[in-house]
Amino acid sequence: MGSPRTCPSCTPSSVGADRLIRASTELRGETQDLIRGLKYRNQRNVVADLADRLVSSILADPHAPTFELVTWAPTSMVRQRQRGYDQSELLAKAVAGRLGLRCRRLLYRDRSAPQTGRNRQERLNGPVFRARPMRRPYRVLVIDDVVTTGSTLRAAAHALDLAGAKEVCLLAVAATPRDRSTNSRVA
């Protein structure tokens, strides 16, 4: 088995650059309102709309690989207890259902503080994830709600690489505007 790879649509254009994170749109307007509703006002009914946006961005990409599993970048336990759910898990399950794929929890987050409210430098030192070793190498799609610096999704990808993933693609519903983000691309 060779070294872990990113999918063609997630491969950075410059050699040695960090893994590219795709987002279906920028965090503005209606999308921002929907995500805030999901995260802070228990509006789980918006999951279907947000999942449709993610699936549309996948299907519009002619280079998207054939994924075998969908997972999510888990939110902190503090936030999950406050909300009663993990919004990224809900999104991942909805995306998997629309794509006819299995959704499994592959990642476990350390007990780090939530990213919300942290400044850019603090976010760059994002959470640490662990993943159980895979029985066989899978092509994994990792879903998250918002990408700001990319540290959360890159940490998730690193854990999956170490667990034996064949390919890891990273997709968020929305990215903060480029001037506040790092190495993310709106699909």
Language model features: what each stretch is:
Residues 1-187:
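Glycine-rich phosphate/pyrophosphate-handling loop used in enzymes and phosphotransfer proteins
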